Amino acid sequence: LVIFIYFRKIIKKENPSRFKEKIYPSHFNIEDKKMNKLIWFHATSIGELKSIVPILKELNSAETKLKFLITTTTLSSSEIAKIELKKIPNACHRFFPLDVNFLVQQFLKKWKPNVIFFVDSEIWPNLIFSAKKFGIPIVLINARITSKTSKRWMWFPGVAKKIFNCFNLCLASNLETKNFLKNLNVENVQFYGNIKLANKINVSAIQNQNKDILVNKRFWFAASTHIGEDEFCLKTHLLLKKKYPDIISIIAPRHIERSKDIKSLSENLNL
């Protein structure tokens, strides 16, 4: 796994100055001794990270003697964290450590969180079992188990039950997830809705930004694209343009760091 992280660094999938955070434990960088409560949120990527920002703001306004550790796994989410966490005092971002027993235990010993919140479908067995062993409360918020994922979990129902029962509380984002956890006889499961829908979106700002581009024009939107799909979308644009000369194609990649690659593909096709 360590070799894999170094390989990802070589192919520019990891931050060259911070990739070791996934291998070595890190210290909190706030020196205020009075701030003795640490809340750890793990949100794997951009969507999960943005969904917890309102929660962080509420917690910070309610209790000023808190410090927050936010961990993510992707390069793109770390860039968003720089922006979002500037608005939240006493918040710190780190990359999530590899889910290897001795690494996660070192991480827990260094940071000593008072509680850990996992967001969405982030299930890391070694960290979960270690936190339980250390007596650290763990909560799964916005829990999301798809029908495909639930079938995989049911290959090992005993293991699934053991893992999910480590959580002190599971807040399901939908009834499908709640029913799945209930069928596993997981305790402390509640349906709380999708917290991603709680974010306030400035619709007017988005409309004003795009109105001149899209007004009176045909357009189509390719959302959450992956490698290999972008070229197909661009070639589709060329085909559509023959019939609809003013067509606008909008591509939103799943991982924002691929934007440069999409731009290069566009230039190669003279777009």
Language-model segments: residues:
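Catalytic donor nucleotide-activated moiety binding site of glycosyltransferases and closely related
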Residues: 250-271
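A hydrophobic membrane-anchoring feature enriched in long, contiguous, low-charge segments
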Residues: 1-3
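Active-site and donor-binding regions of nucleotide-sugar-utilizing enzymes
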Residues: 6-204, 225-227, 238-244, 254-258
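Charged active-site motifs of nucleotide-sugar-dependent glycosyltransferases
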Residues: 34-39, 213-220, 230-231, 245-248
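Acidic/histidine-rich catalytic neighborhood
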Residues: 207
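Short acidic-capped amphipathic helix/loop micro-motif used as an active-site/signal-coupling element
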Residues: 234-235
